[in-house]
């Protein structure tokens, strides 16, 4: 039986091979820490599963109500009342389950912060540390967002003839989602309370607004696509699970890379020089 030979690299790894920009760092992390990102995705799936199941059963009920309406078992008034009640109760349940989803997001935030900062990671220890540090802020941000999303749905459903839901959703996409994403990362990096994080996120959003807006539009595009598939609840649930495991960690990592670039430019260089360029290779003459 032949002995397996260990393959060695043709040359030693040099510090100069480390990424020098946040863009390079993103692909460096994806290539070398994919297993960590995958494990993060599995935790996100586990804690987001109640939300996924809520959407699944909502879609099932919507299909059932529509079939009764088409068959004549339910008149238009009862159909609209049932759909509105389903929307209200579904939104309330989603708000409640954000407390579960916050557990994974808080822990994963710590993991991603460490990856981008170039810090060593012990996954479970860092995950627990992230939950301890970030859970309250993550809960509050998701709670506020869920309330605002529920209000948008309410306005869209009850004032549909005035098209008031459209400006509400536009405001959510243009301002609320980008600011809340930035606030989540700001609170994780600088370990401040959520209100301080939101205040600073509002100030920092506009210099880099187009990048965060693109990230927000990405979320909006996914939700819009899933909305058009709501007549296929099982397919929607499977897609959501795949998104949680494979896409969401990559998305959040990209968000961290963009945010660290912003922090380096507008905060770290002057106020937190010890954080400036963390995780990147910098020649000695630049460090001095």
Where are these regions (language model features)?
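Loop-to-helix entry region at the N-terminal start of transmembrane alpha-helices
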Residues: 87-94, 162-173
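Membrane-interfacial helix-loop-helix connectors in multipass membrane proteins
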Residues: 155-168, 232-239
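Histidine/lysine/aspartate-rich catalytic loop segments that bind and position anionic ligands
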Residues: 165-187
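Helix-coil boundary and N-terminal low-complexity module in membrane systems
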Residues: 1-153, 181, 186-227, 236-239, ...
């Amino acid at each position: 039986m032949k002995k397996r030979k260990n393959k060695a690299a043709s040359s030693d790894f040099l510090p100069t091979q480390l990424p020098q920009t946040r863009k390079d760092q993103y692909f460096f992390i994806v290539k070398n820490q994919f297993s960590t990102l995958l494990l993060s995705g599995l935790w996100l799936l586990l804690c987001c599963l109640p939300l996924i199941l809520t959407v699944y059963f909502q879609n099932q009920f919507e299909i059932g109500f529509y079939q009764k309406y088409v068959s004549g078992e339910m008149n238009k008034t009862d159909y609209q009342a049932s759909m509105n009640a389903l929307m209200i109760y579904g939104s309330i349940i989603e708000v409640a389950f954000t407390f579960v989803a916050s557990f994974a997001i808080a822990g994963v935030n710590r993991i991603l912060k460490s990856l981008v900062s170039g810090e060593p990671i012990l996954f479970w220890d860092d995950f627990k540390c992230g939950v301890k540090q970030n859970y309250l802020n993550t809960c509050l941000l998701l709670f506020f967002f869920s309330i605002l999303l529920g209000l948008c749905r309410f306005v869209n459903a009850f004032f549909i003839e005035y098209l008031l839901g459209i400006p509400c959703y536009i405001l959510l996409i243009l301002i609320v989602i980008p600011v809340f994403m930035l606030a989540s990362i700001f609170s994780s990096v600088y370990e401040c309370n959520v209100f301080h994080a939101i205040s600073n996120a509002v100030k920092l959003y506009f210099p880099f607004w187009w990048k965060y807006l693109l990230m927000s539009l990405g979320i909006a595009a996914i939700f819009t696509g899933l909305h058009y598939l709501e007549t296929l609840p099982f397919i929607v649930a499977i897609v959501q699970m795949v998104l949680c495991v494979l896409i969401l960690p990559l998305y959040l990592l990209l968000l961290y890379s963009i945010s660290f670039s912003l922090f380096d430019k507008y905060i770290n260089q002057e106020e937190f020089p010890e954080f400036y360029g963390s995780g990147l290779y910098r020649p000695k003459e630049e460090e001095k």
